[in-house]
Structures are given as structure tokens and as C-alpha cells.
């Protein structure tokens, strides 16, 4: 609530208090006037009653003078209408209008004071609620700003991570392409020099006078196929990729081994079947030959 509204409210309250005081003063003046009018009416009625009583007495005296001694012998009639005299209020039982007015003013003042206190209490509560609402709004705004900052930082980290991942993949792709190119060039150079290598091997075997056994050939082939594992210069992501690559190569080798074993089993089974057929055919041919010879000699 602004200062202007507070000043306006205070001015309105002062005007209401002044109007209440003026109404009370007017009400007091009206009561005084009514009391004065009531007193004047009572005095006028008393005076009229006194004048009437005096007139009645004078008329009775005149009648007595006219009637003479006849009326003196007659008994004097009693008047059935007594003289009406306004009752006078004793001093101890008089109504104190000032006291009534004072009590009423005190009551109105207390009610007004209670209304003013209730108004200020409500106003204080509203101000406290407004302050708490502002604090709540500021706290919520700060929390929202903090959440937005954290969200922006996470998004920035995610973008940086994606950029690093993209750069790493590009680097791996380039390195793989370079290795493939080098491997192809090496294979071509080996193919070009393969004939000379075979001749040299034959010459060395002829000179040595002995041939390599199958075990030695296997060891030599494995030594040529086995590659040196250089992982000292690789980071965590590259090591993870290298592990995946090795796992894939092992998986492929195991699959190839399984296929070769199944193929070997199939070939072994076929050899056994063919061998059994050959044995059966040889047995049948021997029995047929013996029967023919015996029949011929008979």
C-alpha cells in the first residue's frame, strides 16, 4: 500500500470522526431544546391550572354573595374535580440527560476505537501477507533462475561432449582409413615380393636339407597374424573402442572356429559313411566272385 493511499485513508478517518462529533453535538442541542420546551410546557400548564383554580374560587365567592343567607344555611357541596397540579419530579429522581449523552458518546467512541483498531490490524495483516507474498515470489524467481542456469550448464556440457565425441569419431575414422590404406599398400608390396620370398624360402630349405613341419608352419602363421597391442597412448574412450574391436575380432574368430569344427565333423561323418559303403561293396563283390568260380568248376 502506497503513502498516498495511507494519507487518503487517514484524512477520511478524520472527516468521519469530525462528522460523528458534529452529529453528537447536534443531537445534544436537540435534546437540550426538547428539555427546555418540555419545561416551558409544564410551566405553562401549571400557570393555566392555577389561573383556572383562581377563577373557580372567584366564581364561587360571587355566587355565595348573591345567594345570601340561604346558601349559608345549606351545606357547602364538595367539588368532585380536584385541582390538577402537575407532578413535580424530586431532585433525586431527575433524569440526567448529560450522563446518558456522555455514556452514549463513550459507547460510540469505544466502538469507533474498536473499528479503528480492527482496521489497523487488518491492514497490518495485509501488509504482512504482501511482504510474505513478495518474498515467496522473489524466492521462486531465484529458484527458477538457478534451475535455468543449471539447465544451460548441462546443455552446454552435453553439446561439448557431443562435439568431442564427433571429433573423436572423425579422428578414429581418419586413422582407420589411414591404417587401411597402409595395410593395402603393404599387401600390394608383399604380393609383389611374394614370388621372390617363395624362391628364397625354397633355396633355404634346399640348403638346410630339411622341411618345416606342420607345427612349425602353424607357429609361423600365428606369429605373422598376431599384432602388437599398443595401448599406452590411448585415452579412456579409445581404450573402450579398442576393447570393443578386440571383442568383435574374438567373436568372429570363435564363430569361424565353430563353423570349421562343424565342417570338420560333417566331413568326418561323410568319410565314415563313404568308408562303410566301400567296405560293404567290397564284401559284396568278394562273395559274388566266389560263387561264380565254384559254379564254373562244377
Swiss-Prot record:
Heart. The fetal heart shows a greater expression in the atrium than in the ventricle, while the adult heart shows a greater expression in the ventricle than in the atrium. Isoform 6 predominates in normal adult heart. Isoforms 1, 7 and 8 are expressed in fetal heart. Isoform 7 is also expressed in failing adult heart. The keyword Zinc does not apply. The keyword Acetylation applies. Residues 1-70 have a biased composition (Acidic residues). Signal peptide: none annotated. Gene3D superfamilies: 1.20.5.350. This is Troponin T, cardiac muscle. The gene is TNNT2.
Amino acid at each position: 500500500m502506497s503513502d498516498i493511499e495511507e494519507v487518503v485513508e487517514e484524512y477520511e478517518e478524520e472527516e468521519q470522526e469530525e462528522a460523528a462529533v458534529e452529529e453528537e453535538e447536534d443531537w445534544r442541542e436537540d435534546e437540550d431544546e426538547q428539555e427546555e420546551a418540555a419545561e416551558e410546557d409544564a410551566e405553562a400548564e401549571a400557570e393555566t391550572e392555577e389561573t383556572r383554580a383562581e377563577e373557580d374560587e372567584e366564581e364561587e365567592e360571587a355566587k355565595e354573595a348573591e345567594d345570601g343567607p340561604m346558601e349559608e344555611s345549606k351545606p357547602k357541596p364538595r367539588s368532585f374535580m380536584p385541582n390538577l397540579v402537575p407532578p413535580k419530579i424530586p431532585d433525586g429522581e431527575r433524569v440526567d440527560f448529560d450522563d446518558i449523552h456522555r455514556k452514549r458518546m463513550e459507547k460510540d467512541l469505544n466502538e469507533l476505537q474498536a473499528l479503528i483498531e480492527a482496521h489497523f490490524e487488518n491492514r497490518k495483516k495485509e501488509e504482512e501477507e504482501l511482504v510474505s507474498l513478495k518474498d515467496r515470489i522473489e524466492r521462486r524467481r531465484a529458484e527458477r533462475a538457478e534451475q535455468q542456469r543449471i539447465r544451460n550448464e548441462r546443455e552446454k556440457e552435453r553439446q561439448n561432449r557431443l562435439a568431442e565425441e564427433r571429433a573423436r569419431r572423425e579422428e578414429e575414422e581418419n586413422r582407420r582409413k589411414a591404417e587401411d590404406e597402409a595395410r593395402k599398400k603393404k599387401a600390394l608390396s608383399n604380393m609383389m615380393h611374394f614370388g621372390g620370398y617363395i624362391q628364397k624360402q625354397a633355396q633355404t630349405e634346399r640348403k638346410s636339407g630339411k622341411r618345416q613341419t606342420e607345427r612349425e608352419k602353424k607357429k609361423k602363421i600365428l606369429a605373422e597374424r598376431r599384432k602388437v597391442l599398443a595401448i599406452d597412448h590411448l585415452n579412456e574412450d579409445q581404450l573402450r573402442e579398442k576393447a570393443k574391436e578386440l571383442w568383435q575380432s574374438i567373436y568372429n574368430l570363435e564363430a569361424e572356429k565353430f563353423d570349421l569344427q562343424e565342417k570338420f565333423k560333417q566331413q568326418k561323418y561323410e568319410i565314415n559313411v563313404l568308408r562303410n559303403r566301400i567296405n560293404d561293396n567290397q564284401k559284396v563283390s568278394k562273395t559274388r566272385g566266389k560263387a561264380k568260380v565254384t559254379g564254373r568248376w562244377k
